[in-house]
Amino acid sequence: MKLSDVQKRLQAPFPAHTVSWKPAAFNAERTRALLLAHVDARAVQDRLDAVCPDDWSFEMEVVSGAEVPTVKGRLTVLGVTREDIGEAPEGSMAAYKAAASDAMKRCAVQFGIGRYLYDLPKQWADWDDARRGPKHLPELPEWARPDHERTPGGAHLVQAMEQLRYELPEDLDLQREVYKHLKAALGSIHPVPTGPVPTNPVQGGRAA
C-alpha cells in the first residue's frame, strides 16, 4: 500500500462532532468572536489508525532556546515523512504537550489531513466569555462534512464540484463564465462576513 492509495481517505472531512471552534479575535466587549475551525490531535490519530494503523509513526523533540514552548514533530505515513513545528503559550510541562499536539496537527495537514478546514469561511459568533466558548456553534457547509452526513442534494453538489476540478473547459472565455456563475452561487450561500473590527487578536489562532 502506498500513500497515493489512501490519500482521499486521509483527506476526507471529519465528522461534525469532532470539529471544534476557537477564537482568533474578539470585539472590544468580548461578546463576539471570530471563530476558526480545528480538530484535536486525537482525531488525527484516529484517522491514521483507521486508514493505516500499522504504517504511521510520530516523533518529536523539544526545541531549546525558543521564546515559547516549541516542539519539532516528524510524522511518517507509509514511508513518507513530513516535519513541522508546534508551539504553545508559556507554561509548565503541559504546554509542551500542547506544543506536541500542535506539531502533529501541522504535520498531518501536510498529508492533507484536516487541510479543508483552512478553506472554511471565518465566522463571527456570539461569545460567552464566562464559559470561554461560542454561544452557538457554526454550521459546517455540506462540502465540509463526511459522505454519511451530507444531504442527497449536498452529496451531488460536492460530486459536481470535484468533477469541475478536472473537467474545466479549455476555452478561456468559458472558464471565465464558469467562474462568474460559481462565484455568484457561492456568494449567495456564504455572503461576505461582517463583524466588528478585531481589537485584540489571539496569537496563533489557526485551523488544523
UniProtKB/Swiss-Prot annotation:
Disruption phenotype: Cells lacking this gene show a normal growth rate, do not exhibit a decrease in the efficiency of natural transformation, but display a reduced capacity to survive ionizing radiation when exposed at doses superior to 2.5 kGy and exhibit increased sensitivity to mitomycin C. The keyword Cell wall biogenesis/degradation does not apply. It comes from the Bacteria. Keywords: DNA damage, DNA repair, DNA-binding, Stress response. Induction: Induced to high levels following extreme ionizing radiation exposure. Also highly induced in response to desiccation stress. GO terms for biological process: cellular response to desiccation; cellular response to gamma radiation; DNA repair. GO terms for molecular function: DNA binding. Pfam families: Rad52_Rad22 (PF04098). The keyword Ribosomal protein does not apply. InterPro entries: Rad52_fam. Homooligomer composed of 8 to 10 subunits; probably arranged in a ring-structure. Belongs to the RAD52 family. ssDNA-binding protein that contributes to the ionizing radiation resistance of D.radiodurans. Plays a role in DNA repair and genome reconstitution, in a RecA-independent process, since DdrA is essential for recovery from severe genomic fragmentation as a result of exposure to severe levels of ionizing radiation in an environment lacking nutrients. In vitro, binds to the 3'-ends of single-stranded DNA, protecting them from nuclease degradation. Thus, DdrA is part of a DNA end-protection system that helps to preserve genome integrity following irradiation or desiccation. This is Single-stranded DNA-binding protein DdrA. It comes from Deinococcus radiodurans (strain ATCC 13939 / DSM 20539 / JCM 16871 / CCUG 27074 / LMG 4051 / NBRC 15346 / NCIMB 9279 / VKM B-1422 / R1).
